[in-house]
């Protein structure tokens, strides 16, 4: 059967106390709405409709994609009214209704829910709670069949004792939806059009109301304030940490790892505490990552080592290479096999060949280094003249003395050496020694300045 999905994302989220629409607040570095959309896409629907209201322009701008149809709910008059805004666009056999502030919903749960939908049967997602205060209750008859959903504010004292609650997630036969939504009333405590009222209508029309429950109740936990956002963030991170450990990663403290993207890992990887992985990160076998590191959109080849307090973005570390402690590798940085950058070294769009080393206190930008080069402490590639950037190219086996300024554009040939303290402005041929500093002078009988007596 064909499927369309409606995601409700129009709410203001006043309890977040934020100018940012609630559905754009992040979980694991991604907007909550983005998590829901990604899960919805896995179901391969005909189309995904996103109902927007508060901050509509910003939500549309941030989440724009060819497979999304944004539908405006100008007034927030309830969930039933929100779904009704999408009715003109719906024609599928099944319609699944999701929520933009319920970011941890899982594919398996939705597949089980949809499997129960037929032309004469709808399915809703429920969960049992010890404290169901504030949630709509699932009312069943003596045979256990679902009869209705009663919102907390409208529930009787007896109904408020029910522990099974409505998550809001619902899958219905598409051809029935327009009729049910057209019959909704706002005669209730909140003066809103409740989507949940379609359950009683379906029962009255002779349909069967099936139900399913998630394997993990946190899947259907919504976010209404910063505390709930933090709770879901930690739960999400715990799940990702467990997933990594099942794949052969040693986490020295699973509670002190943050994963904010798509991570591919090999075996026998070790990750120390307070590590943040963002974007697309590939970690091959036997990689070690030290504490307090941030790694974004990078590739770490087999046996690479990232030492403490290092920051990598858009970088690639070759097999057996190492970086840090306190190294910064910016986009376009590549370390060849067994290359090394040490403490307080910054690379930007720079490639170090196999076995090359920059031990400490250096900046290498827009540079290409051959194999087995040695970069002395305090070396800087002067790659920017205030208007344009230029490259520095070193051959193999180049030795750069300490405290050098390499003024680009510049080429240094194989086996060349530069003296400590040099400013190199012209090409250095292979195997040459280049000096670029003032000659030392010694003044005899020099007397140090003395303090002026007051």
Curated annotation (Swiss-Prot):
<dbReference type="Pfam" id="PF12804">
    <property type="entry name" value="NTP_transf_3"/>
</dbReference>
<dbReference type="GO" id="GO:0016020">
    <property type="term" value="C:membrane"/>
</dbReference>
<feature type="binding site">
    <location>
        <position position="437"/>
    </location>
    <ligand>
        <name>acetyl-CoA</name>
    </ligand>
</feature>
<dbReference type="GO" id="GO:0071555">
    <property type="term" value="P:cell wall organization"/>
</dbReference>
<feature type="binding site">
    <location>
        <position position="420"/>
    </location>
    <ligand>
        <name>acetyl-CoA</name>
    </ligand>
</feature>
<keyword id="KW-0963">Cytoplasm</keyword>
<feature type="binding site">
    <location>
        <position position="73"/>
    </location>
    <ligand>
        <name>UDP-N-acetyl-alpha-D-glucosamine</name>
    </ligand>
</feature>
<keyword id="KW-0460">Magnesium</keyword>
<keyword id="KW-0808">Transferase</keyword>
<dbReference type="GO" id="GO:0008360">
    <property type="term" value="P:regulation of cell shape"/>
</dbReference>
<feature type="binding site">
    <location>
        <begin position="383"/>
        <end position="384"/>
    </location>
    <ligand>
        <name>acetyl-CoA</name>
    </ligand>
</feature>
<dbReference type="GO" id="GO:0005737">
    <property type="term" value="C:cytoplasm"/>
</dbReference>
<keyword id="KW-0133">Cell shape</keyword>
<feature type="binding site">
    <location>
        <position position="363"/>
    </location>
    <ligand>
        <name>UDP-N-acetyl-alpha-D-glucosamine</name>
    </ligand>
</feature>
<feature type="region of interest" description="Linker">
    <location>
        <begin position="227"/>
        <end position="247"/>
    </location>
</feature>
<dbReference type="Pfam" id="PF00132">
    <property type="entry name" value="Hexapep"/>
</dbReference>
<dbReference type="GO" id="GO:0003977">
    <property type="term" value="F:UDP-N-acetylglucosamine diphosphorylase activity"/>
</dbReference>
<comment type="similarity">
    <text>In the N-terminal section; belongs to the N-acetylglucosamine-1-phosphate uridyltransferase family.</text>
</comment>
<dbReference type="InterPro" id="IPR011004">
    <property type="entry name" value="Trimer_LpxA-like_sf"/>
</dbReference>
<dbReference type="GO" id="GO:0000287">
    <property type="term" value="F:magnesium ion binding"/>
</dbReference>
<keyword id="KW-0677">Repeat</keyword>
<keyword id="KW-0961">Cell wall biogenesis/degradation</keyword>
<dbReference type="InterPro" id="IPR025877">
    <property type="entry name" value="MobA-like_NTP_Trfase"/>
</dbReference>
<dbReference type="InterPro" id="IPR001451">
    <property type="entry name" value="Hexapep"/>
</dbReference>
<dbReference type="GO" id="GO:0009252">
    <property type="term" value="P:peptidoglycan biosynthetic process"/>
</dbReference>
<dbReference type="GO" id="GO:0000902">
    <property type="term" value="P:cell morphogenesis"/>
</dbReference>
<feature type="binding site">
    <location>
        <position position="101"/>
    </location>
    <ligand>
        <name>Mg(2+)</name>
    </ligand>
</feature>
<keyword id="KW-0479">Metal-binding</keyword>
<keyword id="KW-0548">Nucleotidyltransferase</keyword>
<feature type="region of interest" description="Pyrophosphorylase">
    <location>
        <begin position="1"/>
        <end position="226"/>
    </location>
</feature>
<comment type="pathway">
    <text>Nucleotide-sugar biosynthesis; UDP-N-acetyl-alpha-D-glucosamine biosynthesis; UDP-N-acetyl-alpha-D-glucosamine from N-acetyl-alpha-D-glucosamine 1-phosphate: step 1/1.</text>
</comment>
<dbReference type="InterPro" id="IPR005882">
    <property type="entry name" value="Bifunctional_GlmU"/>
</dbReference>
<feature type="active site" description="Proton acceptor">
    <location>
        <position position="360"/>
    </location>
</feature>
<feature type="binding site">
    <location>
        <position position="374"/>
    </location>
    <ligand>
        <name>UDP-N-acetyl-alpha-D-glucosamine</name>
    </ligand>
</feature>
<dbReference type="GO" id="GO:0006048">
    <property type="term" value="P:UDP-N-acetylglucosamine biosynthetic process"/>
</dbReference>
<dbReference type="InterPro" id="IPR029044">
    <property type="entry name" value="Nucleotide-diphossugar_trans"/>
</dbReference>
<comment type="pathway">
    <text>Nucleotide-sugar biosynthesis; UDP-N-acetyl-alpha-D-glucosamine biosynthesis; N-acetyl-alpha-D-glucosamine 1-phosphate from alpha-D-glucosamine 6-phosphate (route II): step 2/2.</text>
</comment>
<feature type="binding site">
    <location>
        <position position="224"/>
    </location>
    <ligand>
        <name>Mg(2+)</name>
    </ligand>
</feature>
<feature type="binding site">
    <location>
        <begin position="99"/>
        <end position="101"/>
    </location>
    <ligand>
        <name>UDP-N-acetyl-alpha-D-glucosamine</name>
    </ligand>
</feature>
<dbReference type="GO" id="GO:0009245">
    <property type="term" value="P:lipid A biosynthetic process"/>
</dbReference>
<feature type="binding site">
    <location>
        <position position="330"/>
    </location>
    <ligand>
        <name>UDP-N-acetyl-alpha-D-glucosamine</name>
    </ligand>
</feature>
<feature type="binding site">
    <location>
        <position position="151"/>
    </location>
    <ligand>
        <name>UDP-N-acetyl-alpha-D-glucosamine</name>
    </ligand>
</feature>
């Amino acid at each position: 059967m064909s499927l369309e999905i409606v995601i409700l994302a129009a709410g203001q989220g006043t309890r977040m106390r934020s100018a940012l629409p609630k559905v754009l607040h992040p979980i694991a570095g991604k907007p909550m709405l983005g998590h829901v959309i990604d899960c919805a896409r896995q179901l391969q629907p005909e189309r995904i409709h996103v109902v927007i209201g508060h901050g509509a322009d910003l939500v549309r701008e941030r989440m724009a994609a060819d497979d999304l149809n944004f539908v405006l709910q100008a007034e927030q008059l309830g969930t039933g009214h929100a779904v009704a805004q999408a009715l003109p666009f719906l024609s599928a056999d099944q319609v699944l209704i999701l929520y933009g502030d319920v970011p941890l919903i899982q594919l398996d749960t939705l597949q089980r829910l949809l499997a129960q939908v037929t032309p004469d049967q709808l399915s809703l997602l429920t969960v049992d709670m010890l404290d169901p205060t504030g949630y709509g209750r699932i009312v069943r008859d003596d045979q256990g069949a679902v009869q209705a959903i009663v919102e907390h504010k409208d529930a009787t004292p007896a109904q408020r004792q029910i522990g099974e609650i409505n998550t809001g997630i619902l899958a219905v036969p598409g051809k029935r939806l327009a009729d049910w939504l057209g019959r909704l009333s706002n005669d209730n405590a909140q003066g809103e059009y409740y989507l949940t009222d379609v359950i009683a209508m379906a029962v009255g029309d002779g349909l069967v109301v099936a139900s399913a429950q998630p394997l993990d109740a946190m899947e259907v936990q919504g976010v209404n304030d910063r505390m709930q956002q933090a709770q879901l963030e930690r739960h999400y991170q715990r799940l990702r940490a467990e997933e990594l450990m099942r794949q052969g990663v040693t986490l020295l403290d699973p509670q002190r790892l943050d994963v904010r993207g798509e991570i591919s890992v090999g075996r026998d990887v070790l990750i120390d505490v307070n590590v943040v992985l963002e974007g697309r990160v590939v970690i091959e076998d036997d990689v070690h990552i030290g504490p307090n590191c941030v790694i974004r959109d990078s590739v770490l080849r087999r046996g690479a080592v990232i030492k403490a307090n290092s920051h990598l973005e858009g970088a690639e570390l070759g097999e057996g290479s190492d970086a840090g402690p306190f190294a910064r590798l910016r986009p376009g940085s590549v370390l060849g096999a067994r290359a090394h950058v040490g403490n307080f070294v910054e690379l930007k769009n720079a490639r170090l060949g196999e076995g090359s080393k920059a031990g400490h206190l250096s900046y290498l930008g827009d540079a290409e280094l051959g194999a087995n080069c040695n970069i002395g402490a305090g070396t800087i590639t002067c790659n920017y003249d205030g208007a344009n950037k230029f490259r520095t190219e070193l051959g193999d086996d180049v030795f750069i003395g300490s405290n050098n300024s390499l003024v680009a554009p510049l080429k240094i040939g194989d086996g060349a050496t530069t003296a400590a303290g040099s400013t190199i402005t012209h090409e250095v041929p292979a195997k040459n020694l280049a000096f670029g500093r003032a000659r030392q002078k010694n003044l005899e009988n020099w007397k140090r300045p003395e303090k002026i007596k007051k």
